[in-house]
């Protein structure tokens, strides 16, 4: 059976939905019209065929603006889309290798890590040990330190090399651009 409690909708506060004794009103061209009741402000807005939109609820008294609500909503959505487009979420990319890696293979890993860091992603460099190779963790440590040194122009160490089970790993983050 469905729950029949009322769901409070997050409706925008415009026109008749503004419930305050007094509000500060700003006209469409940015001119302050002063403090008045919502009914008086709504009458002015309707004269101009515009809406009364609550801009700041926390101000004393609350601030309302006379404007075209459809246009205002469109502008807000457009700004939100632009902000989302500019935002880049840093992913964690992984570069795997063994401690007995050949020079060319190592350079390939460094180049791919460099590409990831330049695109703004974090890089997790992992060295895997098999069998008794785990005894040579000092060689893996040296290899990760060398990789950090080779990538110091584009990245900085976020997590120092450490051993986890049969792996040794290090995390590099892109350098902050100044």
UniProtKB/Swiss-Prot annotation:
Q: Which keywords, in A-to-Z order, does the entry hold?
A: Cytoplasm, Initiation factor, Protein biosynthesis
In terms of superkingdom, the source organism counts as: Bacteria
> One GO MF term, please?
translation initiation factor activity
List locations, semicolon-separated: Cytoplasm
Write down the InterPro entries for this protein, in alphabetical order.
Answer: T_IF-3_C_sf, T_IF-3_N_sf, Translation_initiation_fac3_CS, Translation_initiation_fac_3, Translation_initiation_fac_3_C, Translation_initiation_fac_3_N
GO CC annotation: cytosol; membrane
* Gene Ontology annotations of biological process type: ribosome disassembly
Under the heading Pfam families, the entry gives:
IF3_C (PF00707), IF3_N (PF05198)
- Name the NCBIfam families on file: infC (TIGR00168)
Annotated family? Belongs to the IF-3 family.
Partners and quaternary state? Monomer.
Q: Which HAMAP family match?
A: IF_3
Which PANTHER family would you find in this protein's record? TRANSLATION INITIATION FACTOR IF-3, TRANSLATION INITIATION FACTOR IF-3, MITOCHONDRIAL
What function does the entry list? IF-3 binds to the 30S ribosomal subunit and shifts the equilibrium between 70S ribosomes and their 50S and 30S subunits in favor of the free subunits, thus enhancing the availability of 30S subunits on which protein synthesis initiation begins.
Protein name as catalogued:
Translation initiation factor IF-3
């Amino acid at each position: 059976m469905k729950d029949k409690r009322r769901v409070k909708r997050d409706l925008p506060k415009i026109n008749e939905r503004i419930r305050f004794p007094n509000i500060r009103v700003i006209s469409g061209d940015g001119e302050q019209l002063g403090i008045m009741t919502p009914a008086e402000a709504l009458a002015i807005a309707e004269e101009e065929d515009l809406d009364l939109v609550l801009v700041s609820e926390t101000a004393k008294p609350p601030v309302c603006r006379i404007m075209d609500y459809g246009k205002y909503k469109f502008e807000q959505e457009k700004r939100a889309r632009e902000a989302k487009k500019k935002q880049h979420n840093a992913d964690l990319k992984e570069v795997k290798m063994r401690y007995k890696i050949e020079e060319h293979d190592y350079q390939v890993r460094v180049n791919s890590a460099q590409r990831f860091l330049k695109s703004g992603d974090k890089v997790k460099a992992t060295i895997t040990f098999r069998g008794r190779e785990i005894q040579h963790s000092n060689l893996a440590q040296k290899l990760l330190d060398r990789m950090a040194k080779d990538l110091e122009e584009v990245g900085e160490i976020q997590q120092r090399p450490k051993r986890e089970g049969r792996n040794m790993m290090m995390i590099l983050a892109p350098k902050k651009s100044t």
